[in-house]
Amino acid sequence: MSAPYINFHTHHIPDFSVETDYFDTHISIVNLDYSDVINPNIPNTYYSIGIHPWSTVCATDAPNCFDEVIEEIRKKLPMKSILCVGESGFDALRGANSDIQRKLFLSQIRLSEKMHKPLIIHCVKMLSETLELYKSVHPTQPWIIHGYRNKAEQAKQLMQHGIYLSFGTKFNEASMHEAWEANKMWLETDASERTIEEVYQTASDCLQVPVETIKEKLYQQFTQLI
């Protein structure tokens, strides 16, 4: 039996009532808002919960508006179906100012460390700041930057410090090659309508590696992660 497809970051919850065969061949990490209801009974479906940088804007006028949210996330994290914290991080184009984003990012880093859950990171035009924060806090839990599109030189710097990169429908081919060779690569659909099969096929074409080989490698990584 071949390894399942791992969709490391998606915003779409598979429909268990319709796609029953899907769950035999796919594993998904679905990103949920901190207020969403979690269904722990969908096979091979895990979740990440956190405060997205885009959601931080309310803290501009009410600095403590997320205190209760952080506590609510903390209460949910012991659920076995919640695999990761996030997506959290920095966005230079949307959300509150960088100081507020940093404060909330740090709060979620602490949750990740305390609850022993990997951290999924949203990062737009703030890779240097993300790397500097990583070096300053020395996390023990894996960090995964999702939707990575930047250049290979930046990718190498991030991976040298232990950060994973997840690639979706748009990516830098040289960066994907670097991540594959470094065993730091994940694949995702994010919010797109493309299937994870299409993403794997695109990665296969880029890497000149069979889809089944990619599936086996990422599944091995996944079993180590959980």
PLM feature segments, named:
Residues M1-I226:
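Mid-domain alpha/beta scaffold segments of enzyme catalytic cores
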